[in-house]
């Protein structure tokens, strides 16, 4: 193995080690946040499970397009997290302009930046900042129930040879966990917006779809029961 290739391989290995170490060090208290509109704020806890490493934590909220101008503020936006410690991020709605007949969805971003280590610098270890992005669902105060109240109301229609259109008449944003078309596992699905629709691309050769089987992710971030529906 020549020198340049050895250096490249070493850098890759060190990067993976640093990333795995970080991934095992910082954790969030949930995989999604439901903001109850009847409350003043929502919260998310950041935990540093490492016994040795310190991290700089940066947080912000944006929309699906990455626009940081949103109705929410998150505090603290920047702080140090010592080994084995935790801190609570607080999310506050600053306006009254959000729709009251359906959920709104935004994104919480949490970036953990490893603190500089003299030992790591001496060994030329590449330390990597990793960002976690999770959904923030704003649920208006007058909206009763939860996401599982809408999962069996989804409507499916054929939208050409390689597409299925999914319509969601409910007031809840519904994210698929598993989705099968004619028994075929469809990996790329996504979220059906509240009172909106989503087109799902099917792999070539799927053929005419007569029924789908699916489940969705509930308020706790876990998968619900499977349901079979016909495709019109």
From Swiss-Prot:
PROSITE patterns: PILI_CHAPERONE (PS00635)
Gene Ontology BP, a term: cell wall organization
Listed Pfam families: PapD_C, PapD_N
Keyword Transferase: no
Gene3D superfamilies: Immunoglobulins
SUPFAM superfamilies named among the record's database cross-references: PapD-like, Periplasmic chaperone C-domain
Secretion signal, residue range per the UniProt entry: 1-23
Compartments, as annotated in UniProt: Periplasm
InterPro entries (UniProt xref): Ig-like_fold, PapD-like_sf, Periplasmic_pilus_chap, Pili_assmbl_chap_C_dom_sf, Pili_assmbl_chaperone_bac, Pili_assmbl_chaperone_C, Pili_assmbl_chaperone_CS, Pili_assmbl_chaperone_N
Record keywords, A-Z: Chaperone, Fimbrium biogenesis, Immunoglobulin domain, Periplasm, Signal
GO function terms (MF aspect): protein folding chaperone
GO cellular component: outer membrane-bounded periplasmic space
Domain of life: Bacteria
Family recorded in the similarity comment: Belongs to the periplasmic pilus chaperone family.
Function: Required for the biogenesis of long polar fimbria; binds and interact with LpfA.
Stored NCBIfam families: PRK15208.1
Designated name of the protein: Chaperone protein LpfB
The organism of origin for this protein: Salmonella typhimurium (strain LT2 / SGSC1412 / ATCC 700720)
Gene name of the encoded protein: lpfB
